């Protein structure tokens, strides 16, 4: 099955089915002309709609605002799913054009910044949503921004809403609630992923990814104290701050205990 939005065949068949990993598919590739200088009161925009399948999870991320909902119904059908097969709808942030079709999915729970909703009841979501899906808060474009980091056989795919609009920018987000916070979220998404699915474009390969050198690789001249278990950023000093958990030092994110080096506390 082709899970890459640019029609490049990804070879999942080379891996044993005994330990399947999550799969990601762009159902509807989004677009926007909001960053065009020619746009004067006639903005055209559609969010990217993504399918995530992980064992018992069938999730649609940002069901969007389509002129015709049949577009989404047909896209799901091509992957072998009915609307009622979807059991979770994820909303990456609070801008309405990303979630107006949420009512299509009557049997699904809704996952968003404040929790996982079942009807009128809400429960906190866990950062490690499943073995292969991690959820982190990524504000800046909007205070309620969250991103999914999905482990697949092709690497980690970040589904990040409008943290990035598309591969080509814009660097300055005219709608961002906080440019400085957005910059931090962009660094986080870039460092934690091999692929990015932006809010209004197709999947693209991450330009930069910090990772642990493979065993036997030549050692860097700079000393390394260790690395973060989440984003694999390398630390030169044990008091370095992690870009994905900047309130913790290396010891905290490594051992997940109260830190005696910097006196910070692990989030419980």
Stretch-by-stretch model annotation:
Residues 1-56, 190-192, 207-221:
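Zn-dependent metallo-beta-lactamase
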Residues 19, 26-30, 42-44, 49-53, ...:
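Core dinuclear metal-dependent hydrolase active-site scaffold
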Residues 40-41, 45-46, 63-131:
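Active-site HxH/HxHxD metal-binding segment of metal-dependent hydrolases
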Residues 61-63, 85-95, 101, 111-114, ...:
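Active-site neighborhood of phospho(di)ester-bond hydrolases with catalytic His/Asp-centered motifs
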Residues 143-227:
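Metallo-beta-lactamase
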Residues 153, 231-234, 245-247:
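Short Cys/His-rich metal-coordination motifs, predominantly Zn2+-binding knuckles/fingers
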Residues 226, 240-250, 257:
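Cys/His-enriched microdomains
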Residues 235, 248-259, 266:
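Cys/His-rich microdomains that often coordinate metals
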